[in-house]
Each structure stands twice: as C-alpha cells, then as structure tokens.
C-alpha cells in the first residue's frame, strides 16, 4: 500500500529537506520516525528546500504494509516520533502508480517580511525589513508571470533538465504588519525564489533598475547574484 503524507516542518532544525550525510535532513527525520513504526521503504519527497527554509504544506510518499488500515492512528503515532520540528497533518492512501514528485501540477511558496521591531524569537521565521512600496513590488513581481527561461534565477547544483518554468502567480500583499510575496508555478529551480525576492528588493532599494530586472528575467544578462535569506521562505502548497 502506498500512502501520501502531508506535513509541515520547521526548517531551522534541518540542513535542508533532502537526506543529508549526517542525517540532518527533513527526509532523514521523517524516515527515522517511520522506522519506529516498522516502515522501512524509501521515503520520496515532492519538493526540496534549502537549509533554513520552512514548509507549512509539504508532501511525501512511502510504501507500507496493508495492515495499516487506520490512517488516523498511523498519523497520531507518526507525530509522536516526528515532533517537535515536524508535524503530520494528514495521511491518505494513494494509487500504486502515484508519483509524489512528477505528478505535481503546481507548487506555491510564500516569502514573509516583518516590518515590526526586531525580535530574536521571530528572526528564524521572517525576514525583518523596512516597509516598502507594496504596489511597486506587485508591479515588479508581475514581470515574472508567464513562461520564462529563468537560467539567471537558479543556483548551481540543481538536477534540472531545463530552466524553463511557467509562473502562474507572482504577487505581493499585506497582512497585519507583514508583507508577503506569493509565488505559484509548475515548478521552481534551486534558489529561484530567493534570487527573485532579492532582485525585486534591489530595484526597490534603487540598486538595480527595472530594465536590468527585465533583462535578467528575459535571460539576457545576470545583474543580481545574491539570494534573500532563507528564513522568510515557506513552501505553502503542492497541488496534484
């Protein structure tokens, strides 16, 4: 029997979502929790995130015995071994041919800025940043929407066969004392969102022109090589 696990995690506790040499990845921790329940099949993840990046909605799949008929009980037991940095939201039975990574239709991320006074208790979960022109940020983010070759918005080391991506949503909105950048696409390159966020901030700061941002999006020339900090970034949705 194959199951789909929907979960969230605190990225500060891990070196990234993928398995790591010293077993410090989200995948390692969740696999370890499953092993306590007698499930030793390879755990597959729908998305990868870097060190310090969080997820409010992540998905994994694993093969388990047919005797796990009570999935709510399995969820409860799995949470015992996953807490405090991973929380299992739901477990569903899926078809045997379900591909947790390749069946994905879209992924969504949110990048959170706080404009309030700095707090060390929040520093790992938001990017503290002065207030900016939200309307202007929306205009700049709009440049990303559509089918793009984002080769200049990609960290090295990825396993992508192509740098072409279709961005469905790239927008900014306010919530209380936060500003949030929301991205939705058919897929993302390694470091794409953090490079995109940093590039938009550079334009807002007057350190990069709109023309230069457009040229980087159009794959003509790379003007920004810097990434926004990982702590403000959240994987927020995966749709099949």
From Swiss-Prot:
Q: How does it assemble?
A: Homodimer.
InterPro entries in the cross-refs: PsdUridine_synth_cat_dom_sf, PsdUridine_synth_TruA, PsdUridine_synth_TruA_a/b_dom, PsdUridine_synth_TruA_C, TruA/RsuA/RluB/E/F_N
As recorded in UniProt, its EC number(s) are: 5.4.99.12
Residues in the active site? 50 (nucleophile)
Summarize the protein's role.
Formation of pseudouridine at positions 38, 39 and 40 in the anticodon stem and loop of transfer RNAs.
Query: Which BP terms from GO are recorded?
Result: tRNA pseudouridine synthesis
Task: Tell me which UniProt keywords the record has, alphabetically.
Answer: Isomerase, tRNA processing
- Provide the protein name: tRNA pseudouridine synthase A
Which NCBIfam families does the record match to this protein? hisT_truA
